[in-house]
C-alpha cells in the first residue's frame, strides 16, 4: 500500500524539479495511469503542461469520443495519426517489432507536436510492471523497451514508474479523480495492435474493434473483471448457412488480478459464453470461430502480444 499524500507531494516536487521552467507534453490516453500523471503534473507546473491524446487508429470503439467528452474541460490536444500508425506496422508480424514500431511512432508524433508548442520534455504514465516486463525480456512496452534510443526531448519524466496498478488506483482516489477513471479497465498503449496476431491491417482492426466491444458489453457490467477483451488469433474453417467460409478466429479473455503481475481467468457460466460467441459470429460475418481463453498469468501474459 502506498502512502498517497506523501507520494503526491513527492511526485509534484519531482515534476517541478525535472521540468524546471520548460513546457512539458504528456501522453494522455484517458486510463488511470495517464490521468494520475496529468493530475500530478497540473499541480506541479500548471499551464506549462500540454496534454496530448493521440488517436492511433488502434483504439476501442467510441474511445476517442469518450476521451473528448471526459477531458473536454482541459486544453487537450487531439491528434489523428491513424494512417501513420497503420503504415508503420505494414508488413510487421513479430510482436516485439510491432511494439517497437508503435513506440517509435508515438515518440515521433510527440516530438512533432512538442516542436509546435516549444515543449522540451515528455511526461508519460509508465508503471512498475511495464518496466519489469520490458527489462526482463518478457515483452517490450511501447513506453519503455519500445521507445527509440534517441529522442528530441531533453527529459522523459515518469512520476509513477515505481507503482503497481493497484497503487496507482489508490493515488487516483486521493487525487479526487472520478470512479470511472480510477477503476477503469487497463487498455494497452499499443491498442488493438497487440490483440491482432500477425500483421496489423485496417480490416483486422475493424473486426477486432467490434468483437472487443461485444465482449466488453457482455462481461464488464455483469462480472466486473480486472480486464477483458477479444483478440484476433488466426483463420479457421467455418460454416454459415450452407456455405463453407474461411474466417477469423476470435479469442475472448477475461481475468481478475490485483496488480497485473499475476492473473486468474474469470469463471463465466457456459450459457453466457455461448451468447458471447453467438453474438460475435452473427454480428461480424467474417468471424468463423470464437474461443474462451482459460490460461492464468503465468504462464501466459494477459495480452496476446
Curated annotation (Swiss-Prot):
Gene Ontology terms: cellular component? cytosol
Top-rank taxon of the source lineage equals: Archaea
Which segments constitute the GMPS ATP-PPase domain? 2-184
Q: Which InterPro entries match?
A: GMP_synth_C (IPR001674), GMP_synthase_B (IPR026598), GMPS_ATP_PPase_dom (IPR025777), NAD/GMP_synthase (IPR022310), Rossmann-like_a/b/a_fold (IPR014729)
Positions contributing to ATP binding: 29-35
Cited Pfam families: GMP_synt_C (PF00958), NAD_synthase (PF02540)
Name the CDD domains for this protein: GMP_synthase_C (cd01997)
| Gene Ontology molecular function, alphabetical | ATP binding; GMP synthase activity
Enzyme superclass (EC)? ligase
| Annotated catalysed reactions | XMP + L-glutamine + ATP + H2O = GMP + L-glutamate + AMP + diphosphate + 2 H(+)
**EC annotation from Swiss-Prot or TrEMBL:** 6.3.5.2
Keywords, comma-separated and alphabetical: ATP-binding, GMP biosynthesis, Ligase, Nucleotide-binding, Purine biosynthesis
Q: SUPFAM superfamilies per the record?
A: Adenine nucleotide alpha hydrolases-like, GMP synthetase C-terminal dimerisation domain
Which pathway, per its entry?
Purine metabolism; GMP biosynthesis; GMP from XMP (L-Gln route): step 1/1
Summarizing the function annotation, the protein's role is: Catalyzes the synthesis of GMP from XMP.
Q: What does the annotation say about its assembly with partners?
A: Heterodimer composed of a glutamine amidotransferase subunit (A) and a GMP-binding subunit (B).
Q: What is this protein called?
A: GMP synthase [glutamine-hydrolyzing] subunit B
Could you tell me which species this protein originates from?
Methanoregula boonei (strain DSM 21154 / JCM 14090 / 6A8)
Amino acid at each position: 500500500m502506498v502512502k498517497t499524500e506523501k507520494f503526491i507531494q513527492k511526485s509534484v516536487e519531482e515534476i517541478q524539479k525535472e521540468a524546471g521552467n520548460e513546457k512539458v507534453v504528456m501522453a494522455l490516453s484517458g486510463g488511470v495511469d495517464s490521468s494520475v500523471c496529468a493530475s500530478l503534473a497540473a499541480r506541479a507546473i500548471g499551464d506549462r503542461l500540454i496534454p496530448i491524446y493521440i488517436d492511433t487508429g488502434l483504439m476501442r470503439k467510441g474511445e476517442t469520443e469518450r476521451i473528448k467528452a471526459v477531458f473536454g474541460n482541459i486544453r487537450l490536444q487531439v491528434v489523428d495519426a491513424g494512417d501513420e500508425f497503420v503504415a508503420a506496422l505494414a508488413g510487421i508480424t513479430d510482436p516485439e517489432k510491432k511494439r517497437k514500431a508503435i513506440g517509435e511512432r508515438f515518440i515521433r508524433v510527440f516530438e512533432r507536436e512538442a516542436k509546435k508548442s516549444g515543449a522540451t520534455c515528455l511526461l508519460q504514465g509508465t508503471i512498475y510492471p511495464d518496466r519489469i516486463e520490458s527489462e526482463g525480456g518478457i515483452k517490450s512496452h511501447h513506453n519503455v523497451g519500445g521507445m527509440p534510443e534517441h529522442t528530441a526531448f531533453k527529459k522523459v519524466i515518469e512520476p509513477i514508474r515505481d507503482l503497481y496498478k493497484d497503487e496507482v488506483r489508490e493515488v487516483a482516489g486521493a487525487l479526487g479523480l472520478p470512479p470511472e477513471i480510477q477503476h477503469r479497465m487497463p487498455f494497452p498503449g499499443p491498442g488493438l495492435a497487440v490483440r491482432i496476431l500477425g500483421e496489423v491491417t485496417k480490416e483486422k482492426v475493424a473486426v477486432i474493434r467490434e468483437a472487443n466491444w461485444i465482449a466488453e458489453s457482455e462481461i464488464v457490467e455483469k462480472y466486473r473483471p480486472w480486464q477483458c477483451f477479444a483478440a484476433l488469433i488466426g483463420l479457421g474453417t467455418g460454416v454459415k448457412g450452407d456455405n463453407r467460409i474461411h474466417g477469423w478466429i476470435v479469442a475472448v479473455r477475461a481475468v481478475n488480478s490485483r496488480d497485473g503481475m499475476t492473473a486468474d481467468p474469470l469463471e463465466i457460466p457456459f450459457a453466457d459464453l455461448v451468447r458471447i460467441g453467438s453474438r460475435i459470429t452473427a454480428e461480424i460475418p467474417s468471424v468463423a470461430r470464437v474461443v474462451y481463453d482459460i490460461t492464468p498469468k503465468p504462464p501466459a501474459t494477459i495480452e496476446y502480444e
